[in-house]
Regions:
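Intrinsic low-complexity/IDR segments
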Residues: 18, 182-185
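Intrinsically disordered, low-complexity cationic segments
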Residues: 21, 156-159
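Glycine-centered beta-turn/loop sites at beta-strand termini
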Residues: 35, 91-92, 101, 111-113, ...
Length: 185
C-alpha cells in the first residue's frame, strides 16, 4: 500500500501510516516537495549506510507523520526512513529553482519546474523531469529517464539509460547520452 507525504515550504498535509493487513505489502510513501514563489534549492541524497534519505533546502521545510523528521531542530533539512520511501516528487513554483538528486538515489523521482530558469538533476533511478516555462536545464543521469523541456530554450541531457527527450517550443539542445534514446524537438 502506498501513501503520500507532502513536504512544502509553507503548507503541509501528511497521511499517517496505516498498519498493513496480514499478507499485504508493507506501507511505503511518496515524498512530495512543493516549492514556493521564490527561487529555491533542494537537494536529496541517500546516506552511506542506505537507511536514510536526506532532503535539504534553503527555505524551512515543514513535515508531519513519522517517516520524515527534522534532525536536531534543523528546519531546513529533513531525514526520511529509506525503506518506507518509494518515490520523490518536487513541484517548483516561481523563481529560478535548482533541484538535485544524487546518484545514490535509485527510486523514481519526478520534478516539475515552474516559470523561470530551473535546473533539475535526476538520480540513478527512472526520473521524469519537466522544465516548464523559461530556459531550463534538465539532466537525467542514470536510469531510463523522461525529460520534457517545455516553453523556452532548454538544454536536456539524458545520461546513461534509454531516455526520452522532448524539447518543446524554443531553440533546444538535446543530448541523449548512452543507451537507446528517443529525441524530439
Amino acid at each position: 500500500m502506498k501513501k503520500a507525504i507532502l513536504v512544502t515550504l509553507a503548507v503541509l498535509a501528511a497521511l499517517a501510516p496505516l498498519p498493513a493487513a496480514h499478507g499485504e505489502e508493507p506501507l511505503t510513501y511518496t515524498v512530495l516537495l512543493a516549492g514556493g514563489p521564490e527561487s529555491n534549492e533542494i537537494r536529496i541524497w541517500l546516506t552511506p549506510d542506505g537507511r536514510t534519505y536526506v532532503i535539504d533546502s534553503i527555505y524551512q521545510l515543514e513535515v508531519g507523520g513519522d517517516v520524515c523528521e527534522h534532525p536536531a531542530g534543523n528546519t531546513n533539512e529533513l531525514v526520511c526512513q529509506a525503506p518506507q520511501v518509494a518515490a520523490f516528487e518536487f513541484n517548483a513554483d516561481g523563481g529560478d529553482d535548482v533541484a538535485r538528486v544524487t546518484s545514490t538515489v535509485h527510486i523514481p523521482v519526478s520534478m516539475r519546474g515552474g516559470p523561470g530558469a530551473d535546473k533539475l538533476v535526476g538520480g540513478a533511478g527512472p526520473d521524469k523531469l519537466l522544465g516548464g516555462e523559461g530556459p531550463d536545464r534538465l539532466i537525467g543521469r542514470e536510469g531510463d529517464d523522461v525529460l520534457l523541456g517545455g516553453d523556452g530554450n532548454d538544454a536536456l541531457y539524458g545520461g546513461h539509460g534509454n531516455d526520452t527527450l522532448r524539447g518543446g517550443p524554443g531553440a533546444d539542445e538535446l543530448n541523449g547520452g548512452s543507451g537507446e534514446n528517443h529525441l524530439e524537438q
